[in-house]
Amino acid sequence: MLLGQCQYCGFCERFGCEANAKGSPHITVIPVALRYSNVDLRTYCWVTKVLMDSTGKKATGVAYVNVLTGEEIEQPADLVILAAYGLSNVHLMLLSGIGKPYDPETQTGVIGKNYAYQGGSNVALFFEGVSFNPFIASGGWGTSIDDFHTNWNFDRSKHGYIGGSYISVGGSNGRPITYRPVPPGTPPWGSAWKRATAKWYQSALAIGASGMVMPNRYNTLDLDPTYKNRFGQPLMRMTFDFKDNEQKMNRHSAEVIGQIGRAMNPTIMGNPNPRLTWNVVPYQSTHNTGGAIMGTDPGTSALNKYLQSWDVANLFVMGASAFPHNSGYNPTGPVGALAYWAADAIRERYLRNPRQLV
């Protein structure tokens, strides 16, 4: 597919690209797939569950609702692949009764286990008279260091945690409406806020740390006992907070980025802000992993190494829901690699002889 050229409009992050300059699925993967006569793309469809046979060991298709008409449809299938967002994959498995739901008290079950997020810290820097042109960030520019992440020579023991954080400085957006960095102490509204917004839009920079999150028995996904979606199904409930390991790691990364920030000699510097507790209100990360993890033991994992369900041989589950824990790095690259890995196993091994591949 031929991509367009970036227009440096400032709306790259979190938006579709009107110039078709980003490698988004709707201008790359989907148009290529639609060239094949055996591909049928159905929009405005919400899958509600995986259909099973009487044994509960074989998927027979999926049920979905046309959200425009409300029509409920059952689509038969010999092979089912869950390729929704990771959280949605877990939700569908729970709704469909596939695999045993995880119980944090007894530590039995596998579906909903090992939910993980990302830790980290950040600090804002303001440089009077310097222009960083955030609106031409093209989705992400800058640099990062791995000294406190995957560097085996970094002694973590004296800081009291395992894992680590990579540290980066740069920009990922310049959205003219929502990107409005102002120094600490600026009024949240009024003429002073407007002046600060205009003055510092071009001249603000952030240093951030993105840290690992280790699995914890009490960080889980399950079906909510109270709240339901528009189709009357239980919503998925996320139970999560940063534990002692992440708090120590985030405090340490805040110290490091503070040192880096002061060495850059900004006009104004905010306070380094470690993530010590999870909160849905301020943006922290969007990288969710776990809940339907892969492994070598059906008693402790939901999927085998080919992302095939241990319980239902003709069901494969893509996405970061397969990750047993979360790295400081974003999961996008490995998600794509695992999808290729699983697709190859499906085509070269499963379709030739449908069975458990492990």
Regions found by a protein language model. Give the residues of each.
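Conserved redox-cofactor binding core of oxidoreductases
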Residues: M1-V47, N279-Q284
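A glycine-rich dinucleotide-binding beta-alpha-beta segment and adjacent secondary-structure elements
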Residues: Y8, T48-D53, Q202-V213, Y218, ...
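Glycine-rich loop(s) and the adjacent beta-strand/alpha-helix scaffold that form part
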Residues: G23, Y36, C45, K49-D53, ...
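Non-transmembrane alpha-helical segments in soluble domains
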Residues: I30, M93-L94, A254-G261, A343, ...
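Active-site-adjacent "gating/activation" loops or surface patches in catalytic cores
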Residues: N38, T43, T55-T60, A77, ...
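Short, hydrophobic/aromatic-rich segments at coil-to-beta transitions
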Residues: K57-A63, S203-A206
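Secondary-structure capping and boundary motifs in well-ordered enzyme cores
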Residues: I73, A84-Y85, Q107, M249, ...
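FAD cofactor-binding and catalytic pocket of flavoenzymes
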Residues: T108-M236, F242-Q247, S285-G290, W310, ...
